[in-house]
Each structure stands twice: as structure tokens, then as C-alpha cells.
């Protein structure tokens, strides 16, 4: 697979899409580390596996309609449905994110996709970053990060300055 991205506003040709086949709708709230998930759980609106599967299927249909090639994540035993956090591309390099320890297992979902890419870079363990915190705009790379000393205590701060 040839990859090359310098600007996220360019036409989308390929995309990695997650799935919800192993999604657990009946989850204990203590297993939720993400405040948004907890917010919806406490209001009785935590996502339903089958509704998510339908939404992802419809999303794929729209992408295909516009000629976008879809690469699916491997099915692993997590509540992972989005691929954006797992990595990002700068030019022809795929960077594997160094994500929260509670989510490290999600990286396994990229296994089949990564086999098709030549230039894969795994960041050091102490350089925490998620793909959603990186935005490319031609010659500029924007990275949102949390720089305070209490970083280790923040579960919503997922990118640090070292990244």
C-alpha cells in the first residue's frame, strides 16, 4: 500500500475503518476510563453493538460511493471502533501511536494493515501521542498536547510534549 499525506484537507483516497464486532454494550462503568463514555453510560445512552455495526456499515457505503478504498481493522477483543487514535501518517511514514496503557491492546487491530505499509515507525513508550491529536496542513504539523506537570494523573490528556 502506498501512503502519502501532507494535508488532511486533500481528497480522501484510502481510510482505515474500525468495527464493533467485539464491542461490549453491557459493560461495567468501572471499566470505562474515557469521561465521554462514562457520561453516556450514566445517562443510559451507551452505544449498542448492533446499532454501531449498522452505522459503520452505512458510513462505509458513503465512502465507497465516493471512491474511497476501505481498509478494515482486524477484529480484536476490545471496545475499539475508531482507528484514528491508533496512528497517523506524515508523508510516507505511518507512526504507531503510543497510547494509554488501558488501550495498548487496540494496536493489534492494525496488524493486517501494517503488513501492507513499508515505512512504519513505533514511537518510544514515553512519547505519548494519539493520531487524533495530529493535524497536517502542507508544511505545518499541528499537535495538541498537555504540558503540565500533572500529565500522568490526567486520563484525558493523551499526548505529551515528548511526542
What does each of the following model-derived ranges do?
Residues 1-163:
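The feature marks the mature, well-folded catalytic cores of soluble enzymes
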Amino acid at each position: 500500500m502506498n501512503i502519502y499525506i501532507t494535508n488532511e484537507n486533500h481528497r480522501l483516497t484510502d481510510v482505515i475503518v474500525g468495527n464493533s464486532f467485539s464491542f461490549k454494550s453491557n459493560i461495567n462503568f468501572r471499566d470505562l476510563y474515557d469521561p465521554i463514555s462514562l457520561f453516556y453510560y450514566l445517562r443510559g445512552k451507551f452505544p449498542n453493538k448492533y446499532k454501531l455495526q449498522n452505522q459503520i456499515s452505512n458510513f462505509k457505503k458513503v465512502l465507497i460511493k465516493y471512491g474511497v478504498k476501505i481498509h478494515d481493522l482486524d477484529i480484536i477483543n476490545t471496545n475499539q471502533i475508531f482507528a484514528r487514535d491508533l496512528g497517523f501518517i506524515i508523508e510516507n511514514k505511518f507512526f504507531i501511536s503510543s497510547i494509554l496503557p488501558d488501550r495498548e491492546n487496540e494496536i493489534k487491530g492494525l496488524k493486517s494493515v501494517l503488513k501492507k505499509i513499508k515505512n512504519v515507525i513505533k514511537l518510544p513508550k514515553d512519547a505519548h501521542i494519539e493520531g487524533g491529536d495530529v493535524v497536517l496542513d502542507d508544511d505545518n504539523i499541528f499537535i495538541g498536547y498537555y504540558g503540565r506537570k500533572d500529565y500522568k494523573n490526567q486520563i484525558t490528556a493523551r499526548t505529551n510534549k515528548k511526542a
